[in-house]
C-alpha cells in the first residue's frame, strides 16, 4: 500500500458512502441476528440488543469498509474506548488498561 492509497482510503466521500452502507446493513435481518446474541463482541458483556452498537473492526478512518466481515455488535463503552484503533492496537490498549 502506498501513501497515496492510504489517503484515498480516508477520503471523506468514501467514508460517507461507507457510513450509508452501514445504515442500510443496520436495518438488515443479518444485523438483527448478530445483535440477537445480546453480547458485546469485545468484552463479552451481556447487553440488550437495543443497546448494542455497530463497530467497524477496522475503522472507516483507517481504511475499513462496511462489509459483514468487518462489522460486529459491541457495547457503547467498548465502542467509545476503541475509537479508531485497529484490532492489534485495541488489544494492546486493553492489556495496558487492565
List each model region and its residues.
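Short, charged surface segments at domain edges that flank catalytic/cofactor-binding sites
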Residues: 2-42
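Short, cysteine/histidine-rich loop/knuckle motifs that typically chelate Zn2+
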Residues: 41-44, 77
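Histidine-centered catalytic micro-motifs used for acid/base chemistry in nuclease
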Residues: 53-59
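Short beta-strand-alpha-helix junction that forms the catalytic/metal-binding core
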Residues: 63-81
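Short, non-ligating residues that shape and space the ligands of small metal-coordination modules
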Residues: 49-50, 81-85
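Cys/His-enriched microdomains
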Residues: 38, 52, 69, 73
Amino acid at each position: 500500500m502506498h501513501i497515496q492509497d492510504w489517503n484515498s482510503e480516508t477520503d471523506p466521500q468514501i467514508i460517507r458512502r461507507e457510513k450509508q452502507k452501514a445504515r442500510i446493513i443496520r436495518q438488515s435481518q443479518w444485523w438483527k441476528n448478530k445483535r440477537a446474541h445480546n453480547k458485546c463482541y469485545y468484552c463479552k458483556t451481556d447487553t440488550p440488543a437495543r443497546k448494542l452498537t455497530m463497530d467497524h473492526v477496522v475503522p472507516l478512518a483507517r481504511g475499513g469498509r462496511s462489509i459483514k466481515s468487518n462489522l460486529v455488535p459491541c457495547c457503547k463503552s467498548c465502542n467509545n474506548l476503541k475509537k479508531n484503533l485497529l484490532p492489534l492496537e485495541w488489544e494492546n490498549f486493553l492489556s495496558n488498561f487492565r
